[in-house]
Curated annotation (Swiss-Prot):
Disulfide bond sites: none
Pathway membership, UniProt: Secondary metabolite biosynthesis
Claim: Methyltransferase is one of the keywords in the record: yes
MF (Gene Ontology): O-methyltransferase activity
Any matching Pfam family: Methyltransf_2
Protein name: O-methyltransferase pyvH
Keywords of this entry: Methyltransferase, S-adenosyl-L-methionine, Transferase
Length: 426
């Protein structure tokens, strides 16, 4: 008789976990633990152990769901509420490291009742392994809560997602009904929750604390493995611009559209001395940016120009970088951005797009696909955008102008974002 699925899963979980455990032992790395001094992340390298790690996570998730059964896992639970309370009331920083505190004392410091403090913390303990209760009535740290207590960036990340995104999710379907799913960034669940007609980035200009928290969260997310600018700097054949330059000079010009403070442009200029970079962004974004670039020789080949990417492009160039530009915009607005480039495009000019290329379901590991689907719903909730698949990207460029030709589209090994090379054939 063939083994049942749950026994098969348990066996495969054991096999993959053994590979991860052997790697940790061989490299004298700490074993995962919920304890206060447990490691906060996996520092694993190598394709085999990474694959085993992802497999163990996916198989464990499936086994957990099978053992629960659909009648249980379909029940809605207030899964984010306890973390939202922990974030809003900064509970983690009020629990002593390598110590404990009574619920009564903790409640007093947090400005909550003892009953609510106890219920939020105990939910977080059993559902998220955030905090522990070493003896009845007393709270101490777990690895996760200690991370929150000691790392202000992680507190920013939790606060952004739980205090800004989480309550907006409940308003998203209402926004779709109310605004007829029109794709505008100021007609979202986020807008209904915050009671504003401003898009998030406009709202942040008058809410500096939220703006700082958002910037901190985005910096954290961007620098995660596979999302840093290294993917673009190292993953694109920049030297090919020399062979196909449309410029009248010997140094190809690359315009970084929406290039923020010039970090990515400087990295490209440093890695490729043959290129000249021009960073374009809104005046408030680029003000003083060049003076803040590191004093290295490549800095002389990075210039800045105030420009709104919805306005007609004024600078003819060999290539235009659009890194994380389309990610925040619906198709109708992404088409506007592309059409604004057309006035300055010369035959053979390239668009180098660095953004998500969502694969079809089942290609990614379960953990990575879950993260992708999370981001897709977050983009809907915050700005009416979405994560585009290959066919979506091709359709977008065709809708903007049939003279755009998608020459290549790929995701570099180890990256979570892809690179599209689009040629202007006008």
């Amino acid at each position: 008789m063939a083994s049942s699925r749950i026994v098969e899963l348990a066996t495969r979980i054991s096999e993959n976990t053994a590979i991860v455990d052997a790697y940790l032992r061989e490299n004298q790395l700490p074993s995962p633990s919920f304890d206060e001094d447990g490691p906060v992340d996996f520092a694993i390298q190598g394709e085999e152990v990474k694959k085993a790690h992802e497999e163990a996570i996916a198989l464990s998730w499936e086994l957990h769901r099978l053992l629960l059964g659909p009648s249980h896992f379909l029940r809605p639970v207030p899964n984010g509420l306890s973390l939202q309370a922990i974030s809003k009331h900064d509970i983690a920083t009020k629990v002593p490291v390598h110590g404990k505190i009574s619920y009564a004392a903790l409640a007093q410091q947090c400005g909550l009742s003892e009953i609510n403090t106890r219920r939020f913390v105990r939910y977080a303990i059993v559902h998220h392994r955030v905090f522990c209760e070493p003896q009845p009535g007393y709270v101490a740290h777990s690895a996760a809560s200690r991370l929150l207590a000691e790392d202000p960036v992680m507190r920013d990340v939790l606060s952004h997602y739980l205090e800004e995104c989480f309550p907006s999710f409940a308003m998203t379907l209402r926004a779709i009904d109310q605004f007829q799913d029109n794709g505008e960034p100021n007609q979202t669940g986020w807008n209904l929750y915050h009671e504003t007609q401003d898009a998030p980035w406009d709202y942040y200009e008058t809410h500096p604390a939220m703006a700082r928290r958002f910037a901190s969260t985005m910096a954290y997310e961007t620098e995660r493995e596979g999302r840093s600018s290294n993917v673009l700097v190292e993953g694109y054949a920049w030297t090919s611009l020399l062979a196909e330059t449309t410029a009248t000079t010997t140094s190809p010009l690359v315009v970084d559209v929406g290039g923020s403070r010039g970090k990515t442009a400087l990295e490209i200029a440093h890695a490729h001395p043959e290129l000249t970079l021009l960073v374009q962004d809104l005046p408030s974004m680029i003000e003083g940016a060049r003076d803040q670039l590191p004093a290295i020789p490549a800095r002389e080949r990075v210039q800045f120009m105030a420009h709104d990417f919805f306005a007609p492009q004024l600078v003819p160039a060999d290539a235009y970088i659009l890194r994380h530009v389309f990610h925040n915009w619906s198709d109708r607005n992404a088409v506007r951005i592309l059409r604004a480039l057309v006035p300055s495009l010369q035959p053979g000019a390239r668009l180098i797009v660095n953004d998500y290329i969502a694969p079809v379901p089942g290609v990614l590991s379960l953990a990575k696909e879950q993260r992708l689907r999370e981001m897709d719903l977050i983009m809907l909730t915050l700005c009416n955008a979405y994560e585009r698949e290959e066919q979506d990207w091709k359709r977008l460029f065709q809708e903007a102008d049939p003279r755009f030709h998608v020459r290549t589209m790929s995701v570099p090994k180890g990256a979570t974002e892809g690179i599209l090379e689009v040629i202007w054939e006008g």
